[in-house]
Amino acid sequence: MQIFVDADACPVVGIVEKVAKEHSISVTLLCDTNHVLSSDYSEVIVVGAGADAVDYKLISICHRGDIVVSQDYGVAAMALGKNAYAIHQSGKWYTNENIDQMLMERHLNKKARRASGKNHLKGPRKRTSEDDEHFRESFEKMIHMAMDKEN
């Protein structure tokens, strides 16, 4: 098992690395040339800038049983299609049971924005320590579940 993080503007990289290190699981952070990262623990892969370049690279290297951390529903759907696990930075698990509805809602919201002429959305609220703790707990559960299924 390996952990892959869609790391462009991802607020939980530190938590992912800490938890992964506690379980001796390797982590790969993927980012584009606009968000270059460095890490003492993780492998960092920098992908050329371009729409979805990081997403396609991540999906090309993840495998069955790996864990993908991403806020992108499309990446999550492709990871699930490869029988990998996927988790949002909020701690919500993407599953085969919920991904279709999430993708449909994203599509309908995009359509509504186009129709109304509103293309700029308000950003997410400021992240709290409770958000971080919720993600850590959910991520830990996912790791344990994946490890149990691996054995």
Stretches found by the model and what they are:
Residues 2-151:
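Nuclease catalytic cores that cleave nucleic-acid phosphodiester bonds
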